[in-house]
Amino acid sequence: MQASGITRPTMDGTIFKKYTDFIYDKTGIRFEETKNYFLTSKVLRRSEKLGLDSYEAYYHYLTTNVDRRKEVEKFIDIITIHETFFYRNQPQIESFEKDILAPLVARKKGGKIRIWSAACSTGDEVYTTIFQFIWNGWLKDVSLEITGSDISHQAVEDARKGVYTEYAVRNVPPEIKNKYFTQMEGRQTALSDEIKKMASFKVVNLKEPSQTRALGKFDIVLCRNVLIYFDSAAKEQVLWNIYDTMEDNSLLLVGHSENLYGFKHIFQAQKELSNSFAYKKAPPGTEKLHV
């Protein structure tokens, strides 16, 4: 049977809620009604692939089939992979370099800096950060350990492969691009093994404390343009999980539209950067308990 039997462009309220509850349980991300068309298109794609003829049939497959684990991974992949690119938001990059990284390198000279890109997608932010260290000659002064994580298995696999479209690397400085990328067929370019070896990538669900704690402690956590996808309860859990990966003087960087005003018991603002905010852990003795 073919999914072409499904003719409605969007799901009705009952089955849509089943899917959104399922997604929320797995990821902490809440899909609102405005995302109905987007979600429906993804369900249709996977239904056609499996030869299923209704939204209900695919939902049943996701939740009861003995082989559902792999399909759940694929479904989460197609609804969570977001477009990104190298050197995204140049003012933000420059401010991060000048106001955060340079002082940190000076303070940690002769030591190690650990950075976590908490929702790294296909690795663009991770590799951009590595290039910042190379460009500024900081690797003579410190060793860098950088980890990228994402809930999407496909995104993490792509990050490890390090193959990108020309569009994704359009902002990379020519000196960097010429030295560390190799042109491929089909308007794609491959990152050098030398750079790929400097990063590690893991599949991590940010709302699962056992997964985030296993990463260890970091000097900087990058979590930009991610928290907007969580509701308040899930966001609080994610923030506590990030909190546990940070030292007292570590910094969390979020996007400019992601202020943490309602979570001052977890993080307190330190400085506003260009299109970004930097936060430190709230001091002990705040009014809400960390469970």
Enumerate the predicted regions with their spans.
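A short glycine-rich, Lys/Arg-flanked "PGG" loop and its adjoining helix->strand segment in the class I
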Residues: 236-248
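Extended basic-aromatic, gly/pro-enriched interface segments that bind polyanionic ligands
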Residues: 139-222, 226-230, 234-237, 260-261, ...
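Conserved SAM-binding loop of SAM-dependent methyltransferases across substrates and taxa
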Residues: 122-139
